[in-house]
Amino acid sequence: MFTLVNRKSGVARGALGLALLLMASVASAHEHSRCVVDDRDREVCLHNAARRIATLSPGATELTYAAGAGDQVVAVVSYSDYPPEAKQVASVGSHTRIDLEKLVGLAPDLVIGWVTGNPAEQLETLEALGMPVFYIEPRDVEGVASTIERLARLAGTETAGQAVADNFRTTMAAIEERYRDRESIPTFYQVWDEPLMSVNDQHLIGQVVEICGGENVFGEQARLVPRIDDEAVLAANPEAIVAGGMGEENRHWLTHWEQYPNLTAVAEDN
């Protein structure tokens, strides 16, 4: 049986066929893309696994290496010293001031940005230049594990990344269980010296302090990274002081407190 098709219906059927073809093509392309949602709730998609990654914070560098993508990192920023191999990667400035010309010259196909650490206009400029930017801001243990998994997805290192993420979850759960029934130790975590800064309980570090049996003495502060002074620390009188930052380079952060022998952490050599 033959069906007669007039010109208008033929055009309509042709348009429908084209639309279906386009939809199938889009669906197929999306299916083969590497898509993940970043910590600004944006979907970031790459057609192929990233091969030239720029990490714009020391934390982003460490997490990208943890995801098994260290060999794909072509640019880092100041203080990206872990793992040690990261020190051999080209530096493109600090997390607050990127050498844009140098970064562009390295031709990254993926940039890992820090939501609250990198200036927004800096990352927006990179996006305007056509660089995909994946924003990270892990706030808890699960956030760290999830970030590793998502970075691994973008880098094509899913197997390695999943193993690290699972091990991290297991390790942190074991630590939490170990200290669960012990009395908490009032702890001051120092993230910077000038100005003197700590973290509150909403910060990842604050949560890790708690998991490890500490009680963050500045946990109730409104700001994620509050500025404080010596008087505030003396008033809080922590039993332990922990300094983050640059390893042995900031040893003086701890020796600074030795001038206060009545501070419990100093008296007990904690």
Model-derived regions, located:
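Bacterial N-terminal signal peptides that target proteins for export
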Residues: F2-L16
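Bacterial N-terminal signal peptides
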Residues: G14-S25
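Extracytoplasmic substrate-binding proteins
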Residues: H30-V36, R42-L46, D109-L110, W114, ...
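Short helix-initiation/N-cap motifs at beta->coil->alpha
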Residues: D39-D41, V92-E101, G117, Q221-D230
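A short, structured surface patch at a secondary-structure boundary
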Residues: R51-L106, L110-T116, V217, G245, ...
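His/Asp/Glu-enriched short active-site or ligand-binding loop at hydrolase and phosphoryl-transfer sites
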Residues: V77, Q202-V225, G245
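Structured C-terminal subdomain patch of bacterial secreted/periplasmic proteins
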Residues: I98, G143-R153, Q162, R182, ...
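Short helices/loops that flank or line small-molecule/ion binding pockets
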Residues: L100-A107, L129, I228-N237
